[in-house]
């Protein structure tokens, strides 16, 4: 089970991130999570949105270079050790975490972790077998 993540290369200039958010706002797309990794000249924006296909289309239409990737989203208890348990299950498979980020839904309710693995199928199988709650495009907003 995976979710669709929108990734964009972004010039490291004032107003560029706002332009992405404004474009999505004007088209009625809701952002669940945003991650920005930057260098001196450019950044990579990673988004989870409620309607990824519409987001892709409107961002491309606005001239942004858009890439859609399947990533693994996990819901876990908001408690010490939850992330460690997830990573231990993945470690057993030999899959590698290429990157990850997290966001909270409601304090004390659950935490959401988003992973890009070098072997998604292997990681998903191990996490599912361990009873870890995987999310899809519909449940990421639930």
PLM segments and residue spans:
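A conserved regulatory-domain signal marking ACT and ACT-like small-molecule sensing domains
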Residues: 1-142
């Amino acid at each position: 089970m995976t979710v669709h993540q929108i990734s964009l290369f972004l010039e490291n200039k004032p107003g560029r991130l706002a332009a992405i958010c404004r474009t999505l706002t004007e088209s009625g797309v809701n952002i669940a999570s945003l991650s920005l990794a930057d260098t001196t000249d450019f950044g990579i924006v990673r988004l989870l949105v409620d309607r990824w296909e519409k987001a892709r289309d409107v961002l491309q239409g606005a001239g942004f270079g858009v890439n859609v990737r399947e990533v693994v989203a996990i819901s876990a208890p908001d408690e010490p050790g939850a992330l460690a348990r997830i990573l231990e299950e993945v470690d057993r498979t030999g899959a590698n975490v290429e990157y990850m980020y997290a966001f909270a839904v409601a304090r004390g309710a659950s935490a959401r972790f988003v992973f890009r693995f070098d072997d998604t199928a292997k990681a998903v199988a191990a996490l599912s077998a361990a009873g870890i709650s995987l999310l899809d495009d519909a449940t990421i907003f639930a």
